[in-house]
Amino acid sequence: MEVTIAGILERDLSEGELAEAIRGLREHGAFRGEGLPAAMSGLLSSCNSRLTSASSRIEGLSLLALAVEESPTDVFVQHCVSWLRSLLQIIQSQDPPRVVSLAVFVLRSLLAHSSALPELSREISTNHIPGLLTSLLGLRRQCLVPALEGIRSCFLSYPRACGSLRGKLTAFLLSLLDAENQQIQEVACQCYSLLPSLGSGFSQGIKHTENWERQIQSVICSLHSVFLQLYQGSETDTARYEGSGTELEFPSVEDDGTHGVLQLARRFTALGQCMRLLLREQFPAPVRVPVSDILSLVCRVVNVSPKNLSWHGEESLKLLLLPRVHSSILEILEATIIACGPRLLPFSAVICRLFPQLLLSWAAVKGITGIPSGQERPYSSLRCSVYRVLETWVTTCGISSGVLQGPMHHSDILLANLLSDITPPTDAIKMSTFVQLGAKKQKVSEVGDDDFQSHRKRDNTANVELCAAALKGLCCVILHCGSVIKEDVHRRLQELSIPLLLRLQQGSDQWLGPYISSDCRKELYRLLLCLTLTPNPKLPAPLHCAIRIFRGGTTEESLQVSRFSTEALAICRILIHPRVPSLQRPLPHLAPRPSVQSDAPTLRPPAALSTFPAMPPANHLPPRPTVPAMSTEPPIPAAVPSPPPEESFGEKPRRAVFIHFDKEEPSDVEISLESDSDDSVVIVPEGLFAKSDSKPEPSPPAVKPPTEEVTEQVAPSAVPSSSTAAPPPPPPPPAPPVCAGPSSAPVPIAEAPPPPQQEVDTVININSSDDEEDGEEDEEEGLYDDEDEEDYYDEEEDEDLEGLEEDDYDYEEDEEGITEEEEEDLEEEGEDDEEEVEDEECLMPDEMQIGSEAEEIPDGIETSSLHEGELEEGPPRLSPVQEDEAVDTGLLMLVESEDREPSGEAPGEGLPESDLTRSPPQPPVLTPPSPPDEPPPMEESDVPPLEEPDLEVAPVAEEPVEETEEKKPEEVTVEKPEPEPEEEEQIADADAMLADFVDCPPDDDKLPEPCT
């Protein structure tokens, strides 16, 4: 490689051949590899030898440009200062402008690379930049463009070092803003926009910010002054500049005639470009844009329209220059929109009014309506500028831009101009029916020479840019604001775009104007896609038509049109037939729900539905932490507020009801409403309560969780008395969540309406009977009824009966626990009427009455068993209990509607909380019964503290459990008239269905003892 490089450099190559050789060396990276110091040294020696000779200086500069770009860092640092001096000598010499231009080109690359090296940049900024700027300012007029390029490079790479020459540089640049050479004017404007960043910015660039704000105010003031001189006497608006800026020191305009008007027009255009660059260029410090002053200037310029000027005298020249002035002011508006963005929304009404005002003012000029097809429309460049700014405004502010949404007049004008610019021209044939009598018949060759020409001169590129700009602006408006645009606008656009695209695909012989260009056809396809994606809510989207048209567009001869049609077709197809579920953010996994029999009717409240319930999306994203169905925190008293809604999936908190026996048996049943299966009957395994006692969960020190010992001490007492009632009932609760626990999955039975919203837990003890083997059956005899709730039960009877059908297989097993003697007693005693039977079918599991409803309780009858029958209407009355019902069935629980309230609790009752349930372990609440007619609503946080007031205990509480159960039917039995035959059948049916409600499939851990 070294030999090849040396051979190429030693040859005498022409400028073109040397350029090709340098391009090849750079492509191969010949000087970037390691171990090539000889090649780099050969390049540097060849470069220095050619720079010393004036005849080969161009070749030397070309090799120097290659060395600056390809040299490693150490070589660059070593030779950078010497290269800079060589370039400065070439700039100060009287070399041709071409050599000076090439030297400035190498200088720009050298300054850009050296500014990134701290040590080198410090030396150059201190010792070389001021002299370099002085040399550039002294170049002759033929080298103004290279000089300005070099000055701009110094401003960008070493702005701090250029601050000492700010005044001289400002005067030099202002003198060039009126230059007739457009290239000089553009570079001078670029340099002028960088003046505020020169010098030291002090703390946090405060000096830079002040310089920028002062300079932009000076530019605005100068624009007002120049416009006043240019169109004095033609303005109808009396607005003037009231800012803090001072006019720039331009040289005065000597000629008041045509030359003066042209000079003022060039100055106005240059100042507008300076303002645009001030707003668009990156600045090292935050600045404040004077939006009000800028918009006032824009409105003042736009208000001067062609109707204010005439085509005679000096005003004709001003009228010719007015489109250029308007285009310049539109560039300022576009730069302001880009710089400020949505902060301009308070001025949206003013900005939206500018577009139709400009389009309408230039469309009303005389003589522009008779332009034949195939010719460029007048003021097309100005209209393109309007559509470009419109697209920028809508893209920046979106649907808040207000385009085509404001006053009907302005929206209609804008839409009409857009449609006229995207509609292809048509040839109009004028037919005349007037025939002069006695006139000579014309020859065919003489007909239509002026009115009908099938072949005329046309420009195939005419109005292509205008049509493309209008389509882009319209696509942007429809895409961002299509859903709020009027229905009529959508209909008109559909009626225009769809037939036109079909004509284009069919290859119509008619000339279609700008749609010969592939850019216009592509934008027309894009308009149809935007109409499909953002339709009006009251108008159907052209989805199916779009699919057909896009399918035809895939065969377009233009590659960009076919590529876009393929993309649009894929979008439309996926709208109609999604292939797979879309990727979603990680969702919490719900706790597993127990299996429910398919034929069981449910009244379960709506749960959180997934986007694809049938087939969950197989996301590869990691799932979020699961939201527990039940709180895993230690149990808290009922007075503490309920868990937040997100822990119960947005539902209301549940109220748990537990049924504990004085003598825990392996077959005991614990029923909890803290389950998302609405009703869960869980068979508690043997030893579960013992485990929970050994591992009590923490609770607040003020309230001690009930223990089994307390229950055993209170167990000898009789059935709870009526003096004990539940606290004031809160609102009804919703359906329970999943009950997580160590035991097997609960077997769901009949669905229940949502329980009260916030209620305290209720623990009810039911004493066992004489025969322990029939312990489940004798507790069922008196758990259900209350005459005050029968109205609601009538409404819920049908739903509960449907829920009971799923447990038909339990009825046969439950019949085994009913003896013949019990059946005879049931036929003899008919104290339960039809309404009481309905009540038995609808009771909630947390409200347990003993026996059926009794109309009257004789004096002297023990009412201690009313503890478990307290409802929100007041203390219930005991119903007569037959002797045979004591051994009827096992534990029987029915689910009431959501209006039912919890029953009372006996003092000291309850067992320590097991892992199966998460109800707060609190002592039973003993409060007086609530009034029977006005149940006060009560939130969970308002529940009074747990107390055990001194209440009278019936004497029967001192008797043993067996004796209490034996005497119980005699004490509460009240003679009643025999029921009718229909009532007997209803009682039998109700007993059968109530029996189905109790027995459940055995637990996975341990089978319960069979009922006898």
From Swiss-Prot:
InterPro entries reported in the protein's UniProt record: ARM-like, ARM-type_fold, PELP1_middle, RIX1_N
LXXLL motif 6 (motif): residue ranges: 223-227
Gene Ontology MF, one: chromatin binding
UniProt KW keywords: Activator, Cytoplasm, Nucleus, Repeat, Repressor, Transcription
Residues spanned by motif LXXLL motif 10: 529-533
Annotated region described as Disordered, given as residue ranges: 586-651, 684-986
Localization: Nucleus; Cytoplasm
Motif annotated as LXXLL motif 7, chain positions: 317-321
Domain of life: Eukaryota
UniProt motif LXXLL motif 1: location: 21-25
Gene Ontology cellular component annotations, sorted alphabetically: cytoplasm; euchromatin; MLL1 complex; nucleus
Any one GO biological process: rRNA processing
Sequence motif LXXLL motif 8, location on chain: 415-419
Ranges of compositional bias, category Acidic residues: 769-844, 936-951
Chain positions of motif LXXLL motif 2: 63-67
Motif placement: LXXLL motif 3: 107-111
Biased composition (Pro residues): 614-626, 634-646, 726-739, 920-935
Signal peptide (residue range): none
Motif LXXLL motif 5: chain residues: 216-220
Ranges of Low complexity composition bias in the record: 714-725, 740-750
Record's function text: Coactivator of estrogen receptor-mediated transcription and a corepressor of other nuclear hormone receptors and sequence-specific transcription factors. Regulates oocyte maturation. Enhances androgen receptor (AR)-mediated transcription in a SRC-dependent manner.
PANTHER family in alphabetical order: PROLINE-, GLUTAMIC ACID- AND LEUCINE-RICH PROTEIN 1
Protein family membership: Belongs to the RIX1/PELP1 family.
Domain notes per entry: The Glu-rich region mediates histones interaction.
Protein name per Swiss-Prot or TrEMBL: Proline-, glutamic acid- and leucine-rich protein 1
Upper taxonomic lineage: Eukaryota, Metazoa, Chordata, Craniata, Vertebrata
Encoding gene (name): pelp1
